[in-house]
């Protein structure tokens, strides 16, 4: 079963792309919600991430499969040293870009100090907690990581529901001003 990135989440993720970015990769494109939000960029969406030639991108935006049983195109005998599939793809992408925006399971950071330290050493700029209802039928809490190579300040924690409430309030305030 694939879990399609909801369009609102895809838009939120793409809003985090650095302004000077041109060449963007979505290494694990599924139904295309993230891809649809990337118009105006030179987008690379390989049909098989595992067969891709090494390259460098201005930014990578992705929602990788969290488990190898949901990943397509894995080479026979592929060994990823016991890492969960999504985390493996994330670490490979860290070699290909200075900016990564990734929808990941919360346990990527909550059940391993080693993974958290590794992400922070790259530059874990922000983590946005997503609502449990983000993916219907999924039992995994998810979040969006914003990685920026060299970022060494405190990681910013956000709650997606609060971002939406603030945005709606701002729109209401603007409407009130126009009356």
Each language-model region and where it sits:
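Class I S-adenosyl-L-methionine-dependent methyltransferase catalytic core
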Residues: 1-179
């Amino acid at each position: 079963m694939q879990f399609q990135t909801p369009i609102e989440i895809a838009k939120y993720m793409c809003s985090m792309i650095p302004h000077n970015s041109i060449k963007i990769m979505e290494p694990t494109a599924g139904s295309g919600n993230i891809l649809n939000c990337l118009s105006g960029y030179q987008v690379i969406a390989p049909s098989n991430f595992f067969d891709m030639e090494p390259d460098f991108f201005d930014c990578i935006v992705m929602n990788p499969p969290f488990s190898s049983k949901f990943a397509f195109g894995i080479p026979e005998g592929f060994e990823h040293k016991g890492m969960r599939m999504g985390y493996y793809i994330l670490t490979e992408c860290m070699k290909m870009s200075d900016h990564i925006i990734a929808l990941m399971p919360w346990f990527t950071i909550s059940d391993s100090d080693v993974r958290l330290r590794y992400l922070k050493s790259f530059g874990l700029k922000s983590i946005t907690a997503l609502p449990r209802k983000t993916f219907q039928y999924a039992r995994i809490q998810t979040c969006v990581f914003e990685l920026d190579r060299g970022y060494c300040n405190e990681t910013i924690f956000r709650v997606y529901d609060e971002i939406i409430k603030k945005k709606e309030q701002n729109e209401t305030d603007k409407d009130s001003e126009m009356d």
